[in-house]
């Protein structure tokens, strides 16, 4: 305490109201990060005072009056913690509550302090038999600990927690295990005050006197935390009531008595003391606190006054303070003349940049009590009066008990209007003349412009939620082409965890990831849960589909079955309240780590680093340096995802500092330097540690998580063209440099450094307009880098699940804080542009096709025979007959409407149960070489035994006689046949391929349901009827058998070729349909066995398919569009 220290200001604290009596101050403390002094009173009210003048800043009710006085404060960067007898309160410094924690176990809490986890966790205790650990972020009790003593004060010093007991003892607790490692006897009564700093602990307390009961001891006890021994006490003859250790001078303490006498002493030399006296007049001292900076202290008296002492020239509270946020200054409105003729729009609106409070989100708006419907005028004009009112004759214009909608919410601009079903369009086109058809086509073109409309928040409609609608014909009747007229396929929704669609699209259009995924998929990998294989299958399907809709069901099913996906909150069903932007960023980190690990399992690495690691890994060395002793430890570090870190709020708000560029943000994020508390092996205690990364190399694909959490970061992204489409990176002697714009061009012109140029491939964006829309994710992707044309131009597309549209680059990279923000960004080296590697097609590992994988003995050769490598190796054009059987894994969801109609919300979900593939030609034509039963691990709703031939137990590995294999095992065989160029022959294959989740080009499909079809009859014929009518065979007598169905389809194809060669195809088809009309298209003796079970679509049974048909032309492609087989020359 210097000579110029004196009392600077006295603040009177009184509760709200007109002249109420003063409420005693129960505790107070200086803020550790801002120029604030916090006080709490006996009624639970918390008040803060700002700066040396002690101006009132905030005041709020932290605890109920019944909870008693506020006992203690603790401070974090985000807020203020306070504790009372039965509750713990956490609020922002502005007074807004973050959480308030109560529990029946909180009976008499007294104190709290931070644990070894820093400000993330606190330990609370009191005069009761339990202590509690509380998570500060979540506001929940995470652990309950039994305790033998009752604690009243708790202080932390280094690795110890010092707790004063109710009986005057001091317990020294280990901050990690919270076990008592030393007990001191401090005072014979209770302890009035205690403080600990560095290596010293000082206490004041009470002792009993014969005549005066309990009195303050005339000394202060001192203990060494270094040796855990008691030192000589410091005398203080007027009675030591309060003691505080100086925050900067480790051996200096300030002792105060209740009458206001203060003494500054050196614990190592107690004889040299500096005395001061506080003028208290008619009160006594109730509290004493030292500022963290050591430049001020405060005293509270019994009259609710706070006295601030310090040097007028140096006084400040924390050592390093952050700016305190104040309310905006309200500008008084200008005076204006007001009359009845003054228009209201002259008042105007204040400038605002956030959603107004009056703009309620859609999920908070509810319709209650619709107005009654208006009575028809014809009824009112014919009413007759009676004693009980009026009555009129019913005009019979409405149905009985018909519900009338009297309030329609205007939602036309909030969601995309679904198109007509294909069956509706087909029926409508048949009834229109040519002129009317052109008019309808023009109207549909105008309807397509609806995708370019905007909602009430200026959100383009193409960003809205898209949903699949289902008619009685199932999903095949939905017009996906309305949403996508590009050569790039979208991904369907209504699949669990389909929020990952946007990220999977981003991987598919990143050539380096795409090439390695397909290279791994072509390897002999047979791990059941390999996500990299599933990613390769999905990418190959998207490329082959070339604009047709696809679904990622197999990938998402494998992903959902991973146990660590649940613990990381990556599954929608287990994380309903987690924001999608957080889930997709966590998924990005998880998938990159997983596929890198899986790639290393199959393909060799050089020096421990695989090709996938070189593509994805940022190699770095992480160093941790102790701020106290400068001891430094270095360890290797690598990461697949770099998370962007933004400047602090006060830096972003400073208008004199220029806004940071994207390259500056990226540099600070990659070289991320943090300060945190950690264990120093040299100091042998927790110290402030400085963490820093030294970059060794950067990958070919730079994956970034936007990690936007503050409003200032959102405003940064809203700056036009803030996100560059090209960046340059230089790594030199461990330093990471990033450039963009003119700086990048300048470095490229100079050519001094080896600079890697990256181009932006795409962005996953979070869309949250709030207008009757659920938050969802979209991807804006530049398809130019993944084009096979070396000179392909940049073309940006929006991928909103199955909606795909070309958009300008400006629109793709435009972000709005209110509804569109980036989540994941992908940059790829420009040297990898257009490097599409298809060499995997020549390196397919086909060993799975020639081996018997079951432990059961091989079936007889007349029932099953594996392919012979030398004579039967699959080749382009080799025909194979295929049929699959399915089971129902989930029932359909149906909504019954008030008018009695039903609408399918989500169709039933089926799973592959058995797949059989037979030879299509050669000596053993018709003999199967694949007949796999698929093991099922999830619950089966219905085995559909009558239509699938699958019985309970057939798909269980423990009980099945068929040795079922994994879905991936069976799928890979079909995938290999597809990429070897085989032609698949079967009946109604579209539904089979969709459930299997594989896309086969039309040139490789021979579908007998399309061969024996006349468009004029609008009905497709089932396999059993065709076998009876064309082949004169009876099939499916007892149950369905996939081998029998596949060989029957093969025979029908051969018979079709005979009809074509003989030139009698058309009369034969007419005869077949004529015969079918006579027997109702059922094979005699079949009864109703061929009717479909509830929930199965017509496509799967070979019935009427709603897709629009055109007259086939001879020589066209196969599959219902042409007559010639792809096998014929």
Swiss-Prot record:
Source taxonomy lineage?
Answer: Eukaryota, Fungi, Dikarya, Ascomycota, Pezizomycotina
Q: What does this protein do?
A: Catalytic subunit of the poly(A)-nuclease (PAN) deadenylation complex, one of two cytoplasmic mRNA deadenylases involved in mRNA turnover. PAN specifically shortens poly(A) tails of RNA and the activity is stimulated by poly(A)-binding protein PAB1. PAN deadenylation is followed by rapid degradation of the shortened mRNA tails by the CCR4-NOT complex. Deadenylated mRNAs are then degraded by two alternative mechanisms, namely exosome-mediated 3'-5' exonucleolytic degradation, or deadenylation-dependent mRNA decaping and subsequent 5'-3' exonucleolytic degradation by XRN1.
GO annotation terms (biological process): mRNA processing; nuclear-transcribed mRNA poly(A) tail shortening
Keyword vocabulary terms for this entry: Cytoplasm, Exonuclease, Hydrolase, Metal-binding, mRNA processing, Nuclease, Repeat, WD repeat
Needed cofactors: a divalent metal cation
- The gene for this chain is PAN2
Q: So what does this thing catalyse?
A: Exonucleolytic cleavage of poly(A) to 5'-AMP
Which family does the record assign? Belongs to the peptidase C19 family. PAN2 subfamily.
Instruction: Kindly give the CDD domains that the UniProt entry links to this protein.
Output: PAN2_exo, Peptidase_C19P
Q: Where are the WD repeats?
A: 20-60, 104-146, 148-183, 186-226, 280-319
Does the entry feature the keyword DNA damage, yes or no?
Answer: no
Q: How is its activity regulated?
A: Positively regulated by the regulatory subunit PAN3.
Per the record, which residues fall in region Disordered? 396-427, 1083-1129
**E.C. code:** 3.1.13.4
Q: What are the Exonuclease domain coordinates in residue numbering? A: 880-1052
Q: Which GO terms describe its molecular function?
A: metal ion binding; nucleic acid binding; poly(A)-specific ribonuclease activity
Region feature Linker, mapped onto this chain = 320-457
**Which protein, by its recorded name, is this?**
PAN2-PAN3 deadenylation complex catalytic subunit PAN2
Q: Where in the cell is it found?
A: Cytoplasm
Quaternary organization? Forms a heterotrimer with an asymmetric homodimer of the regulatory subunit PAN3 to form the poly(A)-nuclease (PAN) deadenylation complex.
Q: Specify which residues bind a divalent metal cation according to the UniProt entry for this protein.
A: 883, 885, 992, 1045
Name its species.
Phaeosphaeria nodorum (strain SN15 / ATCC MYA-4574 / FGSC 10173) (Glume blotch fungus)
């Amino acid at each position: 305490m210097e000579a110029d220290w004196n009392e600077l200001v006295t603040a009177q604290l009184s509760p709200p109201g007109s002249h109420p009596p003063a409420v005693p101050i129960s505790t107070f403390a200086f803020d550790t990060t801002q120029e604030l002094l916090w006080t709490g009173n006996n009624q639970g009210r918390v008040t803060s005072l700002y700066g040396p003048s002690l101006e009132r800043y905030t005041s709020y009710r932290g605890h109920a009056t019944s909870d008693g006085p506020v006992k203690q404060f603790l401070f974090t960067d985000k807020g203020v913690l306070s504790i009372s007898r039965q509750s713990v309160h956490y609020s922002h410094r502005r007074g807004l509550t973050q959480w308030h924690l109560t529990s029946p176990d909180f009976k008499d809490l007294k104190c709290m302090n931070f644990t070894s986890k820093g400000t993330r966790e606190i330990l609370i205790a009191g005069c009761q038999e339990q202590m509690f650990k509380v998570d500060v972020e979540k506001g929940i009790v995470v652990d309950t600990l039994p305790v033998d003593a009752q604690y009243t004060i708790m202080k932390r010093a280094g690795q110890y927690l010092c707790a004063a007991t109710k009986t005057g003892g001091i317990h020294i607790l280990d901050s990690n295990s919270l076990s008592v490692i030393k007990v001191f006897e401090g005072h014979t009564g209770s302890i009035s005050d205690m403080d600990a700093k560095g290596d010293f602990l000082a206490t004041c307390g009470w002792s009993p006197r014969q005549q005066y009961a309990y009195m303050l001891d005339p000394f202060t006890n001192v203990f060494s935390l270094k040796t855990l021994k008691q030192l000589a006490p410091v005398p203080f003859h007027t009675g030591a009531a309060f003691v505080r250790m100086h925050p900067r001078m480790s051996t200096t303490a300030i002792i105060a008595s209740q009458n206001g006498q203060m003494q500054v002493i050196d614990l190592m030399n107690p004889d040299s003391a500096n005395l001061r006296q506080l003028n208290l007049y008619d009160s006594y001292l109730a509290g004493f606190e030292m500022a963290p900076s050591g430049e001020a202290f405060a005293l509270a008296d019994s009259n609710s006054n706070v006295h601030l002492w310090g040097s007028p020239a140096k006084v400040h509270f924390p050592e390093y303070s952050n700016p305190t946020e104040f309310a905006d200054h309200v500008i008084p409105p200008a005076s204006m003349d007001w009359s009845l003729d003054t228009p209201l729009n002259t008042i105007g609106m204040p400038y605002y940049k956030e959603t107004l409070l009056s703009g309620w989100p859609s999920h908070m708006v509810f319709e209650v009590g619709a107005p009654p419907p208006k009575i028809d005028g014809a009824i009112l004009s014919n009413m007759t009066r009676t004693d009980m009112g009026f009555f009129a004759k019913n005009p019979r214009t409405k149905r009985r008990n018909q519900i009338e909608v009297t309030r329609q919410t205007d939602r036309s601009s909030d969601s995309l209007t679904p198109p007509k079903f294909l069956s509706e369009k087909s029926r409508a086109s048949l009834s229109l003349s040519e002129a009317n058809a052109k008019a309808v086509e023009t109207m549909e073109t105008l309807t397509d412009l609806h995708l370019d409309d905007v909602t009430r928040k200026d959100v383009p409609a193409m960003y809205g939620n898209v949903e699949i609608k289902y008619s009685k014909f199932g999903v095949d009747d939905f017009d996906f082409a309305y949403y996508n007229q590009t050569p790039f396929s979208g991904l369907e929704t209504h699949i669990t965890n389909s929020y990952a669609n946007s990220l999977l699209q981003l991987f598919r259009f990143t050539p380096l990831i795409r090439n390695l995924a397909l290279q791994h998929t072509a390897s002999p990998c047979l791990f059941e849960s390999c996500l990299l294989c599933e990613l390769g299958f999905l990418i190959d399907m998207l490329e082959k589909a070339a604009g047709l809709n696809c679904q990622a069901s197999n990938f998402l099913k494998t992903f959902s079955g991973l146990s660590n996906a649940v613990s990381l909150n990556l599954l929608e069903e287990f994380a309903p309240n987690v924001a999608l932007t957080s889930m997709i960023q966590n998924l990005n980190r998880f998938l990159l780590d997983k596929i890198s690990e899986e790639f290393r399992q199959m393909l060799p690495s050089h020096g421990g680093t695989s090709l996938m690691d070189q593509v994805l890994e940022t190699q770095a060395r992480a160093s941790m340096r102790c701020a106290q002793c400068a001891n430094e430890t270095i360890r290797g570090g690598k990461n697949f995802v770099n998370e962007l870190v933004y400047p602090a709020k006060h830096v972003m708000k400073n208008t004199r500092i220029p806004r940071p560029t994207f390259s500056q943000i990226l540099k600070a994020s990659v070289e991320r330097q943090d300060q945190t508390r950690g264990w120093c092996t040299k100091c042998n205690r927790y110290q402030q540690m400085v963490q820093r990364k030294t970059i060794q190399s950067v990958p070919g694909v730079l994956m970034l998580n936007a990690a936007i959490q503050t409003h200032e970061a959102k405003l940064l992204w809203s700056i036009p063209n803030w996100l560059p489409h090209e960046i340059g990176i230089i790594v030199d002697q461990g330093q990471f440099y990033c450039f963009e714009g003119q700086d990048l061009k300048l470095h490229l012109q100079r050519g001094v450094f080896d600079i890697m140029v990256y181009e932006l491939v795409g962005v996953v964006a979070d869309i949250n307009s709030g207008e009757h829309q659920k938050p969802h994710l979209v991807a804006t992707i530049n398809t130019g880098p993944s084009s096979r044309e070396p000179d392909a131009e940049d073309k940006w597309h929006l991928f909103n699940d199955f909606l795909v549209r070309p958009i300008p680059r400006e629109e793709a990279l435009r972000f709005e804080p209110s509804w569109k923000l980036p989540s994941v960004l992908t940059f790829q080296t420009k040297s990898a542009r257009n490097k599409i590697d298809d060499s995997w097609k020549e390196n397919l590992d086909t060993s799975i096709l020639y081996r018997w994988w079951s432990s059961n003995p091989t079936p007889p050769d007349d029932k099953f025979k594996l392919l012979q490598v030398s004579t039967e190796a699959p080749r382009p054009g080799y025909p194979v007959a295929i049929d699959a059987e399915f089971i129902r894994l989930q029932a359909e969801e149906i909504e019954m409407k008030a008018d009695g109609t039903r609408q399918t919300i989500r169709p039933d979900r089926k799973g592959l149960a058995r797949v059989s593939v037979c030879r299509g030609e050669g000596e053993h034509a018709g003999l199967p070489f694949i007949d796999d039963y698929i093991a099922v691990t999830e619950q089966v709703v219905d085995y559909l035994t009558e239509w699938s031939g699958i019985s309970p137990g057939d798909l269980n590995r423990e009980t099945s006689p068929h040795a079922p294999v994994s879905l991936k095992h069976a799928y890979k065989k079909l995938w290999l046949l597809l990429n070897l160029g085989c032609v698949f022959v079967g009946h109604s294959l579209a539904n089979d391929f969709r459930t299997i989740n594989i896309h086969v080009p039309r040139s490789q499909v021979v579908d007998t349901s399309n061969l024996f079809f006349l468009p004029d009859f609008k009905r497709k014929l089932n396999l059993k009827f065709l076998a009876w009518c064309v082949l004169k065979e009876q099939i499916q007598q007892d149950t369905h058998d996939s081998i029998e169905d596949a060989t029957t389809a093969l025979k029908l194809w051969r018979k079709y070729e005979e009809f074509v060669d003989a030139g009698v195809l058309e009369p034969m088809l007419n005869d077949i349909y004529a015969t079918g009309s006579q027997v109702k298209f059922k094979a005699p003796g079949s009864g109703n066995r061929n009717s479909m079970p509830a929930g199965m679509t017509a496509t799967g049974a070979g019935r009427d398919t709603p897709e629009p048909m055109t007259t086939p032309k001879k020589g066209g492609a196969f599959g219902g569009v042409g007559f010639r087989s792809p096998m014929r020359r």
